[in-house]
């Protein structure tokens, strides 16, 4: 009898938060500066810097697409862990190729953006500059950059 009740007693002693699933939220992304109304906005939420900012390589990232049909595009990204340090990167896939088109030296042909409007003088934005703590129903403004 004790062997049957022991696992239940241990489970009951755990804090409730350890038993329940992690809370998630929806990020409300507002993208500004779109100069065309064709294609798709492709966004990724990263929880680690490993593959940031590449949506194409982003394994384990939360991804979302929205029609690029106005100069300002608003859309939601559900399933983001509350309290997690995350960063958002996106690009306007103007030709709907599902990949970011680049010039021969690697400079993006399509507009790009990142949370906190993170930029670098040379190269892709860094995770640490784009990082923020996800809060419930948070709005994330991102201005597109053209190169």
Task: List each language-model region with its residue ranges.
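Extracellular beta-sheet/turn segments enriched in Thr/Pro/Gly and aliphatic residues
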Residues: 111-147
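A short, amphipathic beta-strand motif
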Residues: 27-33, 43
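Short, flexible loop/turn segments at beta-strand junctions in immunoglobulin-like
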Residues: 33, 76-81
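Acidic, glycine-anchored loop motifs typical of Ca2+
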Residues: 93-101
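Surface-exposed loops/turns
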Residues: 36, 69, 82-83, 136
